[in-house]
Amino acid sequence: SNLSRIPGRGFCFKECLRSKTITNRDTLFQKPKTTEPFEFNDSVAMVFDDMLQRSIPMYQECQDLAAHWCAKYAKPSTSVYDLGCSTGSFLLKLAQALPPLKNIKLIGLDSSQAMLKKAKGTLRNSPLPCEMIQADLNENLSIDNASVIVMNYTLQFVRPSNRSTLLKIIYNALVPGGSMILIEKVNSKIPGLNKTFIDFHHQFKEEKGYSKLEISQKREALENVLIPWTVEQ
């Protein structure tokens, strides 16, 4: 909750809508265990919104900016895709940001059935209809008539050998003047700078309540699953 001033009446507490959407705290890596490769399964889907908020610096700000960009560049009678839509939280934000009279179709794709199930619950009261499709971004996708295609921290999970093909599919799916919005974790070519970014990132996670054990175990689980590239790549 936060404080807001009522003119002439001092302060009152106001519950943030954002906090209401996060109901399950991420404790998946809290206890020592044999680390398995990270999967987007039921356990992860249940806590994923909290995991994102506490793992990615300026996550909410990036989502807000992406929604504003979509609202500006979405064209009437086209589709807006969220590739790797996970729990549907960005699609909901997008549905709230888009003008209702543009006849825009919102489509979310994800390979995880658990995530899509969670997304359907998230989007139950969406002001715009959203179509949910189970699809693997490592395989040939059937997407078209897109004025905007969004990838929020998703390309890094696509196998490196498949990324070029996926980007070509995305390009060919865009209508003239269409846009792709890519938000991604990247590595630096400068080793010292890259280490500094990693140190700052771990510090951020600790400030958000993660222990050193949680950070270490999750990092190990993501090894060879999340593979960031440099900007130049």
Ranges and model annotations:
Residues 21-37:
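N-terminal auxiliary segments of SAM/dcSAM-dependent transferases
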Residues 34-38, 43-62:
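Class I SAM-dependent methyltransferase Rossmann-like catalytic core
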Residues 58-76:
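Conserved alpha-helix/loop element of class I SAM-dependent methyltransferases that forms part
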Residues 81, 88-139:
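Class I SAM-dependent methyltransferase SAM/SAH-binding core
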Residues 150:
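A conserved beta-strand element that flanks and buttresses the S-adenosyl-L-methionine
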Residues 164-176:
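A short glycine-rich, Lys/Arg-flanked "PGG" loop and its adjoining helix->strand segment in the class I
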Residues 177-185:
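Conserved beta-strand signature within the Rossmann-like core of class I S-adenosyl-L-methionine
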Residues 185-233:
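C-terminal alpha-helical "lid/dimerization" subdomain adjacent to the S-adenosyl-L-methionine
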